[in-house]
């Protein structure tokens, strides 16, 4: 059963601790996926590792680095001179936030990277990330912009018409 009433807000310290745990968790995912990929592809099958395997590793490292750096900069806390926590940073666990999309990119890259130990064609699944980005761009920015009403005079015209009708009704009474 869901709790009644308003959802409690979280303090700076709790956000700071949760951000630290979230960053640790995603760092473990990154290190684990890279360890599995390097062990299987570049150690066991070193003789058959092609240019594309090395390119995929470089691409995944770039994606991991950019995503993790963005998340850690968003979660950067501010401390006062005496060491007290002034700001816990942005909440990385906030729904529909930018950090949620960065976490999805890290998870997608890790899944694709581990599955690509079996076939390099699995990297085509990474096209889901730009597809999702285009979808979000359309739904949140471009779609509303293209379908927005172009004029505000219409409400003024309707207000005038409504006032006229009210006056006519008053005259009839």
UniProtKB/Swiss-Prot annotation:
Top-level taxon of the source organism: Eukaryota
Keyword annotations from UniProtKB, A to Z: Acetylation, Autophagy, Endoplasmic reticulum, Membrane, Transmembrane, Transmembrane helix
CC per GO annotation: endoplasmic reticulum membrane; intracellular membrane-bounded organelle; vacuole
Localization per Swiss-Prot or TrEMBL: Endoplasmic reticulum membrane
Sequence segments annotated as region (Disordered): 152-173
InterPro entries listed in its UniProt record: SND2/TMEM208
Listed transmembrane segments: 25-45, 51-68, 105-129
Location of N-acetylmethionine modifications: 1
Organism placement in taxonomy: Eukaryota, Metazoa, Chordata, Craniata, Vertebrata
Gene, per the UniProt record: TMEM208
Compositionally biased spans, kind Basic residues: 160-173
Biological processes, Gene Ontology terms: autophagy; vacuolar protein processing
Protein name in UniProt: Transmembrane protein 208
Membership in a protein family: Belongs to the TMEM208 family.
Job of this protein: May function as a negative regulator of endoplasmic reticulum-stress induced autophagy.
Pfam short name (any one): TMEM208_SND2
Membrane topology: Multi-pass membrane protein
């Amino acid at each position: 059963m869901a709790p009644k009433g308003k959802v409690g807000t979280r303090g700076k310290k709790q956000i700071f601790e949760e951000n630290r745990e979230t960053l640790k968790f995603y760092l473990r995912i990154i290190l684990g996926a890279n360890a599995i990929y390097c062990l299987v592809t570049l150690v066991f099958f070193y003789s058959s590792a092609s240019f594309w395997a090395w390119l995929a590793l470089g691409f995944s490292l770039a994606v991991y680095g950019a995503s993790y750096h963005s998340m850690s900069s968003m979660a950067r806390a501010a401390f006062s001179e005496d060491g007290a926590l002034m700001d816990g940073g942005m909440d990385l666990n906030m729904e529909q936030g930018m950090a949620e999309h960065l976490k999805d990119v890290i998870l997608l890259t890790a899944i694709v990277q581990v599955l690509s130990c079996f076939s390099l064609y699995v990297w085509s699944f990474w096209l889901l990330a730009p597809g999702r980005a285009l979808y979000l761009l359309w739904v949140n920015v471009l779609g509303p912009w293209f379908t927005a009403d172009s004029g505000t005079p219409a409400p003024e015209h309707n207000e005038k018409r409504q006032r006229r009708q009210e006056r006519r009704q008053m005259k009839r009474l």
